[in-house]
Swiss-Prot record:
Family annotation (HAMAP family): F420_ligase_FbiB (MF_01259)
Cofactor binding: number and manner: Binds 2 divalent metal cations per subunit. The ions could be magnesium and/or manganese.
Reactions catalysed, as given in the entry: oxidized coenzyme F420-0 + GTP + L-glutamate = oxidized coenzyme F420-1 + GDP + phosphate + H(+); oxidized coenzyme F420-0 + FMN + H(+) = dehydro coenzyme F420-0 + FMNH2; oxidized coenzyme F420-1 + GTP + L-glutamate = oxidized coenzyme F420-2 + GDP + phosphate + H(+)
Annotated a divalent metal cation 1 binding sites: 105, 146
Protein name stated in the entry: Bifunctional F420 biosynthesis protein FbiB
GO molecular function, one term: GTP binding
Amino acid sequence: MSDETRDAAPGRRDGYRVWALPGLPEVQSGDDLAKLIAAAEPALADGDVLLVTSKIVSKAEGRVVEAADREAAIDAETVRVVARRGPLRIVENRQGLVMAAAGVDASNTPAGTVLLLPEDPDASARGIREGLRDTLGVDVGVIVTDTFGRPWRAGLTDVAIGAAGVRVLDDLRGGTDAYGNPLGATVVATADELAAAGDLVKGKAAGLPVAVLRGLPQVVAEDDGEGARAMVRGARDDMFRLGTSEAVRQAVTQRRTVRAFTDEPVDPGAVRRAVAAAVTAPAPHHTTPWRFVLLESGESRTRLLDAMRDAWIADLRRDGKSEESVAKRVRRGDVLRNAPYLVVPCLVMDGSHTYGDVRRDAAEREMFVVATGAGVQNLLVALAGERLGSAWVSSTMFCRDVVREVLGLPDGWDPMGAVAVGHPAEEPKARPERDAEAFIEVR
């Protein structure tokens, strides 16, 4: 591409042409796609963009595999399941793409076989670009396309899964719009727009797997560029990394006991949302046996923990523990002291029944204790959903009178431990899966 063309390109708004290439033969393993494309369109020019359907790239690269069981092929290409609806799976595949069936396709391929996506679509695009440069002496952009569904939208469209020589993203952040308003979040997915334009002329069943787009030389780069991988947003940065049902299931199991926190303040609103989840727990007799005391000030936390420490030391000394042993045990309370936020859950027996015998009265209290535990578990799970770490510690149960006195609580409020809350100092470790069968008896 000449310097004159490159200099003029950014200001061009004259429109563009896009057309499909007829006459391409059925692609076989080992075929040179660049030579096939050059033969079909020898008049390619600098600044053109080639839009190449991934199916023919896969065929040329020998990505057609025998697979009587398509589901097994999908399993092999899957890194994680994002969502599942009946037989349909939306997954992240080994290329980092989130798509239906990991890109495994049983169409346009002989019976008993499936097409896998190219192993490295960016490398595939680079190879085609280099081949066209060698064959025709032209400097073009190449995009490998595949068909995707889209969140919140019906229907399918083509997007870029591989690219070479194309400015795949147009980052407008830091600029202004026509009214002078700052652009703070606008990054245009140029390669996807080009892929969709090509799909208009290629179609889905017309046997036209390659399109040429001409008239937008500003999107073609001198070097190969970052490729389409630069467009893939990682799961950690994705606000919707799981489907609804999958997110609900994961939320229940992602709670961890977190004992070390950063100094980042805890959003009181997040804790209140967790409390709102806590009080949806089951409870006997249509009661609401939960109360949650939120210690939001450092002064209230220190006052409570100092009083609890003194009560604990007194208990340990009565047990005959040495001063060294006492000091060692008391240090275990640091998880509460180092937390930037504490919640003290309490049990109230309002609405409980009195039966007049020890057995049934004990069972009645146990029902309320179980309900309180369910509320605390809801709290912990909801805090995890707010990306907050937590640790339930039993210590307030051993000095309830002290806790009630320091916090000014009614006599009928029974503290049921304390929950340390904060932003985890490090990513919680993955928990090994437990086999449910080890905890089940069937009758």
